[in-house]
């Protein structure tokens, strides 16, 4: 791995260098490194994580450069989410775009370790890495493999809002911890690393949700919540697990 780290140090330098070295030399070295590093290898995954450090320094400029890295590895491969990458580039190339402004706020105002975990789990695992596995599984099983899995940990809710199905149909339906854990483990085998919780109110089960975040630290979790069960203790736990 020492050689790999040295290569990645050169690679990161070339990708983000802004000095006076010949542009032609830099471009040729970039091409050489891209050619010799297989995009599915652990080395490339490590390199992209390393590149995250550069985003922290200047998100507006270096986020664009990071997408350039991904584009170089993806090439014209139809399995590498070309349409999604193009849509993302339109957003980051337009500073007046609302999504662009939201991303910059997240990068600048959110705890650094939380942003790092989101980068690794959402951008790398759920997209760059997971998508390739999903495509392989779609061909293997001749069926669709979802990009994300949505599940209801419980139908219970601490509120009784007029018109909401949770208030009308009761709160007796629950997935056990082991059932949710099994869904996530099976999903990861298919390349799925993004899980969305709805309900009911998912935070009725917040101890289980934190435990699942801790166990599946390579996944990204999103929860639709009414927010009333978020307290200081739970906020500290979310900061601790980061995903």
Give the residues covered by each predicted segment:
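N-terminal [4Fe-4S]-dependent radical SAM core
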Residues: 94-150
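Non-catalytic protein-protein interaction scaffold segments in large eukaryotic complex-forming proteins
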Residues: 22-62
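N-terminal accessory interaction module
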Residues: 58, 66-105
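Short hydrophobic targeting helices and cationic amphipathic motifs
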Residues: 3, 8, 15-17
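Conserved N-terminal glycine/acidic-rich loop preference
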Residues: 123, 130-132, 137-145, 162-163, ...
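Core AdoMet radical
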Residues: 148, 167-175, 190-205, 213-230, ...
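Generic structural signal for well-ordered alpha-helices
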Residues: 184, 209-213, 235
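Canonical Radical SAM [4Fe-4S] cluster-binding loop centered on the CxxxCxxC motif
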Residues: 142-144, 148-177
């Amino acid at each position: 791995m020492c050689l790999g780290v040295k290569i990645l140090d050169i690679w990161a330098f070339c990708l983000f260098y802004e000095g006076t070295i010949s542009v032609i030399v830099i471009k040729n070295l970039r091409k050489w490194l891209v050619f010799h590093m297989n995009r599915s290898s652990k080395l490339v995954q490590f390199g992209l994580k390393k590149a995250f450090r550069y985003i922290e320094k200047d998100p507006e400029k270096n986020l664009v450069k990071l997408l350039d890295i991904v584009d170089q590895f993806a090439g014209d491969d139809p399995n590498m989410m070309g349409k999604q990458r193009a849509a993302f580039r339109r957003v980051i190339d337009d500073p007046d775009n609302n999504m662009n402004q939201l991303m910059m706020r997240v990068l600048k105002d959110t705890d650094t370790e939380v942003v790092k975990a989101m980068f690794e789990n959402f951008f790398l695992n759920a997209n760059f890495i997971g998508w390739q596995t999903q495509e392989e599984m779609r061909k293997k099983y001749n069926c669709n493999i979802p990009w994300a899995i949505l599940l209801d940990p419980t139908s219970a809710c601490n509120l009784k809002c007029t018109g909401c199905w949770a208030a009308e149909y009761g709160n007796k339906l629950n997935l056990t911890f082991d059932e949710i854990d099994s869904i996530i483990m099976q999903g990861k085998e298919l390349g799925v690393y993004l899980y969305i919780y709805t309900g009911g109110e998912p935070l009725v089960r917040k101890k289980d949700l934190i435990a699942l975040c801790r166990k599946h630290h390579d996944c990204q979790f999103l929860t639709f919540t009414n927010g009333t069960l978020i307290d200081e203790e739970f906020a500290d736990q979310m900061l601790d697990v980061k995903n």
